[in-house]
Amino acid sequence: MGDVEKGKKIFVQKCAQCHTVEKGGKHKTGPNLHGLFGRKTGQAPGFTYTDANKNKGITWKEETLMEYLENPKKYIPGTKMIFAGIKKKTEREDLIAYLKKATNE
């Protein structure tokens, strides 16, 4: 799929202000993403989600993240994530490759 190192740079530039990835990492404006893959929307323990996130009911995997990261507010109307999204498919693939590794270590 994507390039992990390029994905890490994208995460630092576009995501790290609001999210952490390491096990036991703290929630910021957005939830800690450790254990993201295979988890349902709105389920990170200790984070307060909107009903829209809790009720979406999808499981995070490569395909759902590809769609979500392109336009979060379109994929989950009512989400409090203010990020506009990543339009370039290759950048989303790189970010997902990084997240797959970093949220599972």
Curated annotation (Swiss-Prot):
Post-translational modification comment from the UniProt entry: Binds 1 heme c group covalently per subunit. Phosphorylation at Tyr-49 and Tyr-98 both reduce by half the turnover in the reaction with cytochrome c oxidase, down-regulating mitochondrial respiration.
Pfam families with a match to the protein in the record: Cytochrom_C
Modified residues (N6-succinyllysine): 56, 73
InterPro entries: Cyt_c-like_dom, Cyt_c-like_dom_sf, Cyt_c_1A/1B
GO biological process: apoptotic signaling pathway; cytochrome c-heme linkage; mitochondrial electron transport, cytochrome c to oxygen; mitochondrial electron transport, ubiquinol to cytochrome c
Modified residues (N6-acetyllysine): 73, 100
Residue positions, PTM N-acetylglycine: 2
Keyword annotations of the record: Acetylation, Apoptosis, Electron transport, Heme, Iron, Metal-binding, Mitochondrion, Phosphoprotein, Respiratory chain, Transport
Origin superkingdom: Eukaryota
Subcellular location: Mitochondrion intermembrane space
UniProt cross-references to PROSITE patterns, sorted A to Z: CYTC
A Gene Ontology term for the protein's cellular component: cytosol
Record-linked SUPFAM superfamilies: Cytochrome c (SSF46626)
Primary location group: mitochondrion
One example GO MF annotation: metal ion binding
In-chain residues carrying the UniProt-annotated modification Phosphotyrosine: 49, 98
Binding-site residues, heme c: 15, 18-19, 81
Additional free-text comment from the UniProt record: Mules and hinnies are heterozygous, having equal amount of horse and donkey cytochromes c.
Record family assignment: Belongs to the cytochrome c family.
Protein purpose: Electron carrier protein. The oxidized form of the cytochrome c heme group can accept an electron from the heme group of the cytochrome c1 subunit of cytochrome reductase. Cytochrome c then transfers this electron to the cytochrome oxidase complex, the final protein carrier in the mitochondrial electron-transport chain. Plays a role in apoptosis. Suppression of the anti-apoptotic members or activation of the pro-apoptotic members of the Bcl-2 family leads to altered mitochondrial membrane permeability resulting in release of cytochrome c into the cytosol. Binding of cytochrome c to Apaf-1 triggers the activation of caspase-9, which then accelerates apoptosis by activating other caspases.
Identification of the protein by name: Cytochrome c
Taxonomic source organism: Equus caballus (Horse)
Taxonomic path: Eukaryota, Metazoa, Chordata, Craniata, Vertebrata
Gene name linked to the record: CYCS
